[in-house]
Amino acid sequence: MTSDDAAAGLVRVLDAAQGAFLALDSYGGNDRSRAVLAMAEALERSFAQILEANTLDLVVSREMSVADCLCEWLKLTPERLQNTVTILKRLASLPDPLQRVMASPYQFNLAQTYCQLMPLGVVALVYESFPELAAIAAGFCLKTGNSLVLRSCGASSHSTAAICEILREGLLDADLPVDSVSHIPSETSPNVQDLVGNASQLNLVIPYGRPSFVEQISQQCTPPVLKAAMGNCYLYWSSKGDLEMVRQMIIDSHVGHPDPVNAIEKVLVSPGQNPAPLVRLLNNLQAKGFKLRGDAELCEQFPDHLTLAKENEWGKAYLDRTVAFRTTQNLKTAIAWINSHSSGHGDCIATDSYQESRQFSMGVDSALVYVNIPPYFCRNPRHGESLFLGVSSQKGQRRGLIGLEAFMTPKQIVQGESRS
């Protein structure tokens, strides 16, 4: 395929996605919910087809010596697919988010002012190794009246193509525009920048994957970008913090499957910490298969438990079951260190002191701050109506948990009295 053919193919996909978005305006919330349910049902009866395609991707990834974490994220199971179906069915059951009316932040004289939520337009999801994200993002987009363009990177092309085809079958069954969900194969657009640099036809780009991948895609984007964050979350262990609480916070944060978004990978230890509980924690984590690292001071104290962490590791995500420990002078120093080294999307403190918890909560510049509770991330939480695609650490309207609100924008309506 020539570069001209690839460019023409990309334009066709984006034009069709734009047309589908405009057509969705004529469908009500019940229609869109019915389509999300139809996509869920189409996926549910196609597990064998998806897993077969996924097997091809796994073979390719092994031949390419892909990183272990990417292979783990890539490998689909019936359980992961069933969880995706469950998320889509829950999305279908939620009230129409476009019917939400919010109070305006300010009012005009002699007029009533309010905000109505509206869809964004055409959303692009650019991701590596998470095939089921294609279906979840499709549900979020369709529920909010947006169209979605998928661009997988790495070795997930067969899985993405199969999932996209099945989602489009669901849209066809529901009699909604099939181009509401489309996939751009790597052979059609080998250069991702051709897609994410298209500000005239895309209204939002969501890069999802390793932090280095997300940053690379974000730097190439000309449309608005919503960066998903992962890993490198910090925990400050106060001398007033309970050992069992710290242990539970660390272990539970690594439970998310396949991507423990809020995994605690760094622990800052207060100077007044008793060595005995720290040894018990290190022993427990080692027994559970964690790899443990530390700064020079702690490695000297606990040579049987810790290996020395390089200086550049404190600002990077491990993305595996690795936790690094570091001493800190005091809470103020810990806050400054976290603000300059963590990913900034989910940081924690373990303490029995209200004053310390308040100082930490106000001082740490993170999207989510957890006090004496594991920062466990779940796309499909048991309680409430909220569902989440991921977490973002960027500043602005879409900071924090990426829910349905991230796929909508407010329109302010100013209504005066009729003079007729």
Swiss-Prot record:
InterPro entries: Ald_DH/histidinol_DH, Ald_DH_C, Ald_DH_N, Aldehyde_DH_dom, Glu-5-SA_DH, GPR_dom. Its EC number is 1.2.1.41. GO terms for molecular function: glutamate-5-semialdehyde dehydrogenase activity; NADP binding. It is found in: Cytoplasm. GO terms for biological process: L-proline biosynthetic process. The lineage of its organism: Bacteria, Bacillati, Cyanobacteriota, Cyanophyceae, Synechococcales. Pfam families: Aldedh. This is Gamma-glutamyl phosphate reductase 2. Pathway: Amino-acid biosynthesis; L-proline biosynthesis; L-glutamate 5-semialdehyde from L-glutamate: step 2/2. Signal peptide: none annotated. It comes from the Bacteria. One of its GO terms (cellular component) is cytoplasm. PANTHER family: DELTA-1-PYRROLINE-5-CARBOXYLATE SYNTHASE (PTHR11063:SF8), GLUTAMATE SEMIALDEHYDE DEHYDROGENASE (PTHR11063). Catalyzes the NADPH-dependent reduction of L-glutamate 5-phosphate into L-glutamate 5-semialdehyde and phosphate. The product spontaneously undergoes cyclization to form 1-pyrroline-5-carboxylate. Coiled coil: none annotated. CDD domains: ALDH_F18-19_ProA-GPR. Keywords: Amino-acid biosynthesis, Cytoplasm, NADP, Oxidoreductase, Proline biosynthesis. Belongs to the gamma-glutamyl phosphate reductase family. It catalyses: L-glutamate 5-semialdehyde + phosphate + NADP(+) = L-glutamyl 5-phosphate + NADPH + H(+).
